Amino acid sequence: MSLATLETRLGHHFGDQALLEQALTHRSHGARHNERLEFLGDSVLNFVVAAMLFERYAKLDEGDLSRVRANLVKQASLADIAQRLELSPYLRLGEGEMKSGGFRRPSILADAVEALFGAVFLDAGFDAARKVIEQQYVPVLANVDPETLGKDAKTLLQEFLQGRKLALPLYTVVATHGAAHSQQFEVECAIPALEIKVTAAGASRRAAEQSAAKLALEAALVVSPRATRKGGRARKTAQLSLPVAVAQEVK
């Protein structure tokens, strides 16, 4: 496939094509691989995203800025960028890695994206790298809620209830299934003030609590979108759009 097409999607045409090829080369393919470029790109990426958040969200404190940045530069987010760039066909992998589906592996895709950022930095300097990174992240930031990104379902449910001066949810393990080494936990999440009671399962108590909290928050948003009101028990399958952070956390 033509590297020129990838360069157009990336928003940078390389003066040194060898840097682009190296950025796309996994260590399974040969000695001149992309791990050092990945290291460099990770640092440039973190700085650029930090600057973008600092300028965009003047009211966020240090802790919230760090939380949002961590979620924007994590593996899943970088793998999403790789998908938008349609990067998989351009990766240079060893035969074994190729056969095992490495071109679809999120870790390999994320590493290659960071390596590309590092390669752009070496090829044309910081301003060019910043432009490329901003081009990838501006549309992402347009759909980000900094108040919820990176917060898990239990935290969001707690904040929702506290904002309405309601008691915190009650989590109860109602059943366990399976052998000791592969147990499934079934947890109930109850919000008495809203007459909500839902259950969910998970491979650990924590995972089950997170899944139950997500269902409870969906139900609470139906029963009490802004203010508390009485009603029948909310259905555990309430269909609502929750912050993306919750959906990712409990997959």
From Swiss-Prot:
Provide the primary localization: cytoplasm
Lineage: superkingdom: Bacteria
InterPro entries attached here? Answer: dsRBD_dom, RNase_III, RNase_III_dom, RNase_III_sf
The record places domain RNase III at 3-125
Name where it's found: Cytoplasm
Q: Where does Mg(2+) bind?
A: E38, D111, E114
Q: Which UniProt keywords apply?
A: Cytoplasm, Endonuclease, Hydrolase, Magnesium, Metal-binding, mRNA processing, Nuclease, RNA-binding, rRNA processing, rRNA-binding, tRNA processing
What family does this chain come from, according to its entry? Belongs to the ribonuclease III family.
Extract the NCBIfam families matched here: RNaseIII
Function recorded in the entry = Digests double-stranded RNA. Involved in the processing of primary rRNA transcript to yield the immediate precursors to the large and small rRNAs (23S and 16S). Processes some mRNAs, and tRNAs when they are encoded in the rRNA operon. Processes pre-crRNA and tracrRNA of type II CRISPR loci if present in the organism.
List the protein's name.
Ribonuclease 3
Which species? Bordetella avium (strain 197N)
